[in-house]
């Protein structure tokens, strides 16, 4: 009879322990149920980028003086600047300016050291294409005004705050 009573006590202790573990699991589950979802439904929801985000480079053709500082400070000598010297006015005339975003590392040196501020970073980060040659942007593509995520009414924007 003693074995039967000790077996019953052991069984009841194991049952209480199992119920406690299940209760702990439920409390963890319920504490996570009140949180906002971490997953962002990408094409329909986008994160608002920070002020210092390094996206696509915007180029203003009229401000550029073809000094080639951007080429000298670039760690991979990426910007291609074509110019000709106008002898009558003794100034460089910019002919073509292009950047290949397939190679660009978005370090921001060209923007930081540009004396005329003709280069700036935008918040655009969707540069993917099926053909890598489409990532070579000339002055016309670089001069296109940046598309703001906030202005698109079809997309729900999400502000993420880091602690």
UniProtKB/Swiss-Prot annotation:
NDH shuttles electrons from NAD(P)H:plastoquinone, via FMN and iron-sulfur (Fe-S) centers, to quinones in the photosynthetic chain and possibly in a chloroplast respiratory chain. The immediate electron acceptor for the enzyme in this species is believed to be plastoquinone. Couples the redox reaction to proton translocation, and thus conserves the redox energy in a proton gradient. NDH is composed of at least 16 different subunits, 5 of which are encoded in the nucleus. GO terms for molecular function: 4 iron, 4 sulfur cluster binding; iron ion binding; NADH dehydrogenase (ubiquinone) activity; quinone binding. GO terms for biological process: photosynthesis, light reaction. It is found in: Plastid, Chloroplast thylakoid membrane. It is a peripheral membrane protein. The lineage of its organism: Eukaryota, Viridiplantae, Streptophyta, Embryophyta, Tracheophyta. Coiled coil: none annotated. GO terms for cellular component: chloroplast thylakoid membrane. Binds 2 [4Fe-4S] clusters per subunit. Its cofactor is [4Fe-4S] cluster. [4Fe-4S] cluster 1 binds at residues 64, 67, 70, 114. This is NAD(P)H-quinone oxidoreductase subunit I, chloroplastic.
């Amino acid at each position: 009879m003693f074995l039967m009573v000790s077996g019953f006590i052991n069984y009841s202790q194991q049952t209480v322990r199992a119920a406690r573990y299940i209760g702990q699991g439920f409390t963890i589950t319920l504490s996570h149920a009140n949180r906002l979802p971490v997953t962002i439904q990408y094409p329909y929801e986008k994160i608002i980028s920070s002020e210092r985000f390094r996206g696509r480079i915007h180029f203003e053709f009229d401000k550029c003086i073809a000094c080639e500082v951007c080429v000298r400070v670039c760690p991979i000598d990426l910007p291609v600047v074509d110019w000709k010297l106008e002898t009558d006015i003794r100034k460089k005339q910019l002919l073509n300016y292009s950047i290949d975003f397939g190679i660009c590392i978005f370090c921001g040196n060209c923007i930081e050291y540009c004396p005329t501020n003709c280069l700036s970073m935008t918040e655009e980060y969707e540069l993917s294409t099926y053909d890598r040659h489409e990532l070579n942007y000339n002055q016309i593509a670089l001069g296109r005004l940046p598309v703001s995520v906030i202005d698109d009414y079809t997309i729900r924007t999400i502000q993420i705050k880091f602690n």
